[in-house]
Amino acid sequence: MLETNKNHATAWQGFKNGRWNRHVDVREFIQLNYTLYEGNDSFLAGPTEATSKLWEQVMQLSKEERERGGMWDMDTKVASTITSHDAGYLDKDLETIVGVQTEKPFKRSMQPFGGIRMAKAACEAYGYELDEETEKIFTDYRKTHNQGVFDAYSREMLNCRKAGVITGLPDAYGRGRIIGDYRRVALYGVDFLMEEKMHDFNTMSTEMSEDVIRLREELSEQYRALKELKELGQKYGFDLSRPAENFKEAVQWLYLAYLAAIKEQNGAAMSLGRTSTFLDIYAERDLKAGVITESEVQEIIDHFIMKLRIVKFARTPDYNELFSGDPTWVTESIGGVGIDGRPLVTKNSFRFLHSLDNLGPAPEPNLTVLWSVRLPDNFKTYCAKMSIKTSSIQYENDDIMRESYGDDYGIACCVSAMTIGKQMQFFGARANLAKTLLYAINGGKDEKSGAQVGPNFEGINSEVLEYDEVFKKFDQMMDWLAGVYINSLNVIHYMHDKYSYERIEMALHDTEIVRTMATGIAGLSVAADSLSAIKYAQVKPIRNEEGLVVDFEIEGDFPKYGNNDDRVDDIAVDLVERFMTKLRSHKTYRDSEHTMSVLTITSNVVYGKKTGNTPDGRKAGEPFAPGANPMHGRDQKGALSSLSSVAKIPYDCCKDGISNTFSIVPKSLGKEPEDQNRNLTSMLDGYAMQCGHHLNINVFNRETLIDAMEHPEEYPQLTIRVSGYAVNFIKLTREQQLDVISRTFHESM
């Protein structure tokens, strides 16, 4: 138990007390103090003059950034740390929430700890030159994560990486997907948190095993990072040592804690957590005391959201191929239901979504509604209304996640749930199941290069592919792949902890935490449809002069995933369960728990490039379907049948998430807005009751996207949902835009 002081008494005045006063327990604080809101959106306030002026400035900077080839400015000398840069502002006189990553908004930081080669490549991609002294330091004197990984990789791992049977690995970029509990800084102040870490350090085991030594060093780094966080606050004129005393301070304290994380790390997903209900407690207290108005509350939220929209990292061209459109995954989880049955919806839940009106649509922050059939009807209707209007919201099934994670979890990146401040993950990208099937047919040889990448066993020699024979070899190939995959991830995360440790994010966790090893699969629908074709049609392999199977001839029809047909849907379910079982047989770094996702981001295009012709009729180089989606155009029985197929994928085997991106034309939801809202709400309820996990919802016509592709200057804020995140459509590459346009747009329910 830690001692509190008069600062805490002042900051906590009017709050209901509990264990949270003596120990870090943000969840209990929320449960004791939040105010459920079941009303409608009529209380919401429009943008203030300051908000409109600031957003005009952001839009002008965004325009200049596009005109400069995607990079407004970049630091090429100073390695980014929590305290590396002076304070920066958009307009100090107008901003209610302040802080940017460098001394100027839109100037991107240089983050070499993950890999100096990547930092250099990011500079050169935009016409900048990395400072010679900085390059020398991180080449000759300070080893990086990337160098450590490649020092330890085996030849087999390198071959799999090059061929693309495992790809997107976080060995050349920050792993991300760790959510610091940034709320702790607002509630307790940094001094309280430092005392807690020192207490843990002084009371832990002194039996110096390797695990104990590592944890003691990590705690020392966490303590140091918290001290630097106070210095960051001082740069902006704030005393973060004490807890926040009002709503504005609570938002500012929380944001500066998040800012420290994104100054120190450039992880693929730097998610925010679950902040709206927590912050609403402060807003309600100030509103009741008459010290703030609703318009002022909304202005502070809008300025906070504005800061989250301009989070930026310098990325390499290879990274941008995998994760297109400059995403940062500042994921904020909104809503959900408590384990006591009370919805966690507050007025702030509305205010966060209302920023899409006040500032216009945007991909960041990645607004994620934790959907439950028990959410208040007015909130459900408002969510549907904003989805139809902006296509900027994703939905995740709180009713199935709450069973595993309780009621204070957040979403990291796209679809990965974790209990805030008590759990982190080792992000693991994806294994390519479609390509693995081709390896089974070709005896471990790569269908594109002819190289022996997989184990060297006899391939399929028959003139017609026979299901049992193919599946037996496929099963053996998945055994091999699971081992190489887990071992690769063990190397990556050992080195990331060693050379690019997330000090401030982990300082905002409990000392003892749950770790997961978050694997993933790509090409699920391609593999399932391919096996269905082999089983129900006649598939003849076509070989080249070396005897390598390079194409297929299909005679007859076959069931296709996405039409609520158990004959093929059961194949998809079996593949997920089977591969997860194989992964679990391998030991993980730090005894992390195995999890898996069915998620591709926009890398479905890259996976397609890496994969040859497949037995389902997909041609070499064609993109895979994103995430757990059916292949483009194959879900022909309407929206509900498509959703039903995806909902069969078992969440118990895919606790890292099952991504489904769903596009529907407005008229199919109804003629009148009220009908559209009601039908979309009913569809979400039905999907949740079927145990579907995740749904990106796009509501627009294909013609809109085609026009935006031809006239991007007219669509600066056109936002679409892709696999697990949102993106400005005009920031996608032409190839990725065409991929999105080619996907199924449901014209009937």
Swiss-Prot record:
Q: How is its activity regulated?
A: Activated by pfl-activating enzyme under anaerobic conditions via generation of an organic free radical. Exposure of activated pfl to oxygen results in a cleavage at the glycine residue harboring its organic radical with loss of the 25 C-terminal amino acids.
Active site, per annotation: C413, C414
Kindly provide the name given to this protein in its UniProt entry. Answer: Formate acetyltransferase
Q: Which reaction(s) are listed as its catalytic activity?
A: formate + acetyl-CoA = pyruvate + CoA
Q: Which organism is it from?
A: Staphylococcus aureus (strain COL)
Q: What is its main location?
A: cytoplasm
What is said about its interaction partners and assembly?
Homodimer.
Q: Highest taxon of the source?
A: Bacteria
Q: What is its EC number?
A: 2.3.1.54
State the encoding gene: pflB
What is the annotated localization of this protein? Cytoplasm
What is one GO cellular-component annotation here? cytosol
Stretches assigned to the Glycine radical domain = 626-749
Say which family it is in: Belongs to the glycyl radical enzyme (GRE) family. PFL subfamily.
What does the protein in this record do? Catalyzes the conversion of pyruvate to formate and acetyl-CoA.
The PTM Glycine radical maps to: G724
PFL domain spans which residues?
3-619
Q: Which leading EC class covers this enzyme? A: transferase
Keyword tRNA processing among UniProt keywords:
no
Miscellaneous information on this protein: Several mechanisms have been proposed based on complexes formed with substrate analogs. After activation by the glycine radical, the cysteine radical, Cys-414, can abstract hydrogen atoms from the other active site cysteine, Cys-413, and from coenzyme A, and it can also transfer hydrogen atoms to product radicals. The other active site cysteine can attack the central carbonyl of pyruvate and covalently bind the product acetyl group.
Q: Name one GO biological process term.
A: glucose metabolic process
Keywords in alphabetical order, please: Acyltransferase, Carbohydrate metabolism, Cytoplasm, Glucose metabolism, Organic radical, Transferase
* Gene Ontology molecular-function annotations: formate C-acetyltransferase activity
A Pfam family reported for this protein in Swiss-Prot or TrEMBL: PFL-like
Which pathway does it serve? Answer: Fermentation; pyruvate fermentation; formate from pyruvate: step 1/1
